[in-house]
């Protein structure tokens, strides 16, 4: 497998239900550094996609059992609902069409609401009416992706980080040989779930002709003190191809603003220009006038891989096996939004294509349950006292903003996937995600990584292999 991180990990987890030897080749140093960790974190209801499309069908399926999945894998999911806010007669007609389409797609919990009900749901919102989607929700995209990967790993899937696939060929017996800078991998089956790289991998398989462009969206993160003002995501009335700049609450209390949409060919640049931040804030303020620069704590961007036709029209998910060109290769192209919501149904659909061609034997030892790192800050006082008695490391707070303890940092450093970066700790614990953005805890965490993993300080990386943080010590010990 070569993978888009959340979908690829979902495929690895679903494949581990069977007696298969699974290897996941990942070009990055963790599973949530690109599209899967750079999005709004919204669990969509399934009303925004063309009836009959895979996007619609798989999104509705993913929404329906996200709660069960969150219980099994111990990640944060809140079914808080969502509103699409309108003001004009044209907006009203668009929302009515959206509800009809959603009902045809099987999406439940959709209704038009007036101004009074809208302000009961979201008191700070500006608008005359809205479509309320009761079944929409929010998820922690980092923890969700990591949970899928850790459960896949616990059930036998091997993860190979820093293994970018640079070539694919087949030998005389039809075995695929995948070339990486760290060696070759031989396999009967290949899954292309490479996200932004799906077009390149598809070409390597000989399945040519897919045009994949990037849609870059920028975001602003607001301080947690704004969270009580936004109980659910607030969207404008969408266009045919774009959901619009929205404001979204998060599972941990922050608010995020965005995204805009800019078509790009460079899939590596994640900078956020000041003018884009100003545009995001101005646009979102029309919906939710609670945005102040003093509350900005960080910005980020994400890029979605969109498969388009010759006229530039965005296409549906493509999930296929081309027996005539690349037998035993599952090819996924254009897996963009709602990929986060639909990840597990996408995985099951892909595996169903495999089952049509190969008898799969169930894995009797498969365990769907994964336990995450306990969050000290979310425990009751009595629970905290008990944890400290059991492990004194819970009594030492390393990240003051998010109240993350030494015990949690240690658990993240020694994570099952063997990720050893600063960002790996950040995404597993929320350390460095608070108001000071690591001003207090970052050096302490770097020191813990150095000590626990017996690394030199110059070997500590932030997220990517070229993200060296330190180049030596000011004072070397004698």
Name the predicted role of every residue range.
Residues 1-5:
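Conserved small/polar residues in nucleotide/adenosyl-binding loops
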Residues 131-189:
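Helical element adjacent to the flavin cofactor pocket in flavoenzyme catalytic cores
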Residues 113, 141, 242, 251-252, ...:
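C-terminal catalytic lobe of FAD-dependent flavoproteins
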Residues 395-409, 429-447:
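Local cysteine-cluster metal-coordination motifs and their immediate loop/turn environment
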Residues 50-60, 85-94, 131-150, 270-275, ...:
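Short beta-strand to alpha-helix junction loop
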Residues 41-117, 121, 127, 244-245:
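Dinucleotide-binding Rossmann-like beta1-alpha1 core, especially the glycine-rich loop
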């Amino acid at each position: 497998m070569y993978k888009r991180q959340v979908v690829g990990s979902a495929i690895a987890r679903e494949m581990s239900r069977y007696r298969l030897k699974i290897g996941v080749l990942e070009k990055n140093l963790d599973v949530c550094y690109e599209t899967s960790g750079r999005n709004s974190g919204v669990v969509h209801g399934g009303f925004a996609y063309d009836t009959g499309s895979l996007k619609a069908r798989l999104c509705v399926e993913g929404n329906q059992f996200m709660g069960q999945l969150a219980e099994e894998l111990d990640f944060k999911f809140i079914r808080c609902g969502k509103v699409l806010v309108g003001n004009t007669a044209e907006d009203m007609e668009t929302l009515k069409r959206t509800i009809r389409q959603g009902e045809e797609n099987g999406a439940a919990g959709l209704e038009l609401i007036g101004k009074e009900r809208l302000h009961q749901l979201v008191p700070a919102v500006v608008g005359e009416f809205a479509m309320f989607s009761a079944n929409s929700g929010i998820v922690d995209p980092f923890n969700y992706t990591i949970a899928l990967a850790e459960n896949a790993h616990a059930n036998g899937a091997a993860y190979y980080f820093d293994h970018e696939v640079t070539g694919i060929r087949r030998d005389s017996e039809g075995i695929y040989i995948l070339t990486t800078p760290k060696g070759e991998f031989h396999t009967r089956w290949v899954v292309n779930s490479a996200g932004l790289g799906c077009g390149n991998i598809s070409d390597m398989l000989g399945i040519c002709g897919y045009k994949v462009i990037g849609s870059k969206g920028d975001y602003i993160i607001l301080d947690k003190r704004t969270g009580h003002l936004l109980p659910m995501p607030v969207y404008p009335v969408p266009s045919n191809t774009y959901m619009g700049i929205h404001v979204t609450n998060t599972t941990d209390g922050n608010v995020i603003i965005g995204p805009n949409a800019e078509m790009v060919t460079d899939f590596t640049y994640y900078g956020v220009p000041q003018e884009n931040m100003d545009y995001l804030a101005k646009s979102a303020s029309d919906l939710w006038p609670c945005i102040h620069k003093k509350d900005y704590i960080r910005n980020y961007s994400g890029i979605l891989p969109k498969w388009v036709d010759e006229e530039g029209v965005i296409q549906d998910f493509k999930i296929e096996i081309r027996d005539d060109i690349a037998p035993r290769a599952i090819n996924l192209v254009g897996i963009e939004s709602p990929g986060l919501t639909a990840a597990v149904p996408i995985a099951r659909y892909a595996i169903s294509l495999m089952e049509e061609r190969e008898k799969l034997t169930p894995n009797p030892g498969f365990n769907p349950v994964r336990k995450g790192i306990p969050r000290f800050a979310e425990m009751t006082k009595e629970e905290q006292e008990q944890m400290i008695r059991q492990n004194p490391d819970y009594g030492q707070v390393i990240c003051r903003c998010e109240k993350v303890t030494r015990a949690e940092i240690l658990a993240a450093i020694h994570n099952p996937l063997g990720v050893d970066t600063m960002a790996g700790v950040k995404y597993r614990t929320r350390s460095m995600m608070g108001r000071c953005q690591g001003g207090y805890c970052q050096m302490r965490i770097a020191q813990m990584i150095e000590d626990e993993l017996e690394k030199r300080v110059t070997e500590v990386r932030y997220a990517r292999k070229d993200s060296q943080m330190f180049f030596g010590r000011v004072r070397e010990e004698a």
